[in-house]
Amino acid sequence: IEEDSFCMNQRAFPADLTYQVVIRLRTSTNGWLFGRVQKPDVVITSIPGGEKWDVTAAPVRIPQIWEFVPLTSMPKDFAEWKTKNWESAPSSGLFDKSTSPQTEVRIPNPLNTGGVDTAINWLNYWMPITGDKATAAPGVWSIRNLAPNEMNNSSSCYDSNNAQYKEKRVTGMVTSNAMITSAGPPQFDAKDQSLNYQVAGPHFEKDGKTLFRGTYDLIMRKDVARCLYGFTDAPIKASISIINANGEEIIATEQIAERNNASGEWITLGKYGFTFSSPRLRVKLTQEKVVAPAANPVQSNKSVMKSNKATITCIKGKISKKITGVNPKCPSGFRKK
């Protein structure tokens, strides 16, 4: 924030505000995006010589861990755990180098450098030591595109170069306020027909009492969903569930939010208010089967003629006869009864 008495002074984001960013790019952006925002609304339009981006979203608070713990307070298996789990991980050491001999352990964020499963392993080890709480939760508003090596061997449907798509463009975006998130876009599980995304973080805010509430947003072009699921052009329905480490569904305080942009090209979903430590977000897309209209009954070429025939009774003495015809007449010697 630039003011008369400050120069680029860093301030926290005010609560309950959204921010809009409009940018013009000389080249088209494509691929998958990752964001640290909430409830994003993205409009991308082609302009002469490039693209125009109009992005509106709210910032999110990302829990961080940065604790110094006396070595004497660490678990008895710390040395063994460190050898097995940390030596080949982040470059930053675990010990506070300002003391000699080293008497404190510096516990940093369990970043995703070793993959989400490794990071969750670190987090699960730290949480009982630090009280399962964040040291801080600074506000962040950021969106970036993922490099090819960050796509985590994801489906080719997320690739802008997929031959099914008419043009190269952004295929979608995933955002969350979790400390740890899956690499790349949600993974498609062909067996469950679901899009899965792993997140993790401490249960509590800095005070150790207030639950930290999670956010998750998924924006995806409809043609990407059709590519993943083999859908037709019929309408697509979506649902989000949150599964904890025990395989049980978590009830979020704010349920699924579906928002449609003006162009109708995007599927936009969100889930908010869930708690940690390591829930898995599961999105299921479904499509109603299109029922073919019943074939019209074949009309007979033969015209249906209405019957104009009549029946009369003719008698001759004790003999009677019934005569049927269009214009029936009694035979000679008979008279009409």
Language-model segments: what does each one mean?
Residues K302-K337:
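Mature, structured domains enriched in cysteine- and short glycine motifs
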